[in-house]
Amino acid sequence: EASDQAGINTNILVNWDCHFFDYDLDGDMDLWFGVGRINQYISNQYNSLYRNDGDLNGDGIPDFTDVAGELGIAGTNKTMGTALADYDNDGDLDILMAHSDRSVILWRNTAVEDGTGAWLKVRLHGTELGSNSHGIGCLVKVHLEDGTVLVQHAYAGDGFLGSSDPAIHFGLGNQTIEYLEVTWSTGYTQIIEEVETNSVLNVEEELPPPVKDFSAYILAVLSLILILLLWPLLQRNS
């Protein structure tokens, strides 16, 4: 258990949602908790957004700082559902919160306006003969110019009875992209080069090349070997 070392303290909270996403586009994954007390006997509890500050003390564990209050999204309402999506298509992920004690709230992210980093949004499109239509379960790796590799899975459903945009969202910091690597659920890996930053990339699944059937050739060779082995015996009997 490394949460205390990382600065993540949620032991006394009632957490309904947990999301890793790069809210500030700096290239590392931040951590969101949607929190809501379940009855009047528990004191008001606040949502948390832990900003990933990297490994500040060299212990091999990323250090996190809760910035939800600073950003104005802490609140004390019962946040029982959260969905992430870039609703305004500006390149950063916005947060939709559903509460049991008030109406839905949509928080617009201003990371792009603040110029904190570049981004990439990947939409996977599987085929009938390959993976599923949204590429659920597939692995996406973004290889950056400095050698960093960003890795995410495509998934469906998160938190308490929730689901977010199926697009896979990457914050890139100030890096450019060398190439993209998609491993489909078929096991086939597809490479995409010349990928632009600050763009939406639609990836159509490539099916693996068909496996060649050599059974007819193998049967012919085995038959020939058998004939050669039996030929002396057949000659003596004739």
Show where each model-derived region lies.
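Secondary-structure transition/capping motifs at alpha-helix termini
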Residues: 22-27, 56-61, 86-90, 113-114
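Beta-propeller blade termini
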Residues: 14-25, 51, 80-89
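Short, conserved, GDST-rich strand-edge loop motifs in beta-rich repeat architectures
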Residues: 34-42
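Acidic/hydrophobic-patterned starts of short beta strands in beta-sheet-rich repeat architectures
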Residues: 25-34, 90-98
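C-terminal cell-surface addressing/anchoring modules of secreted/extracellular proteins
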Residues: 206-236
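Surface-exposed loop and turn segments in beta-propeller and other repeat-based domains
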Residues: 2-9, 69-73
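Beta-propeller blade repeat segments, especially FG-GAP/WD-type strand-to-loop junctions
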Residues: 1-2, 41-67, 103-119, 145
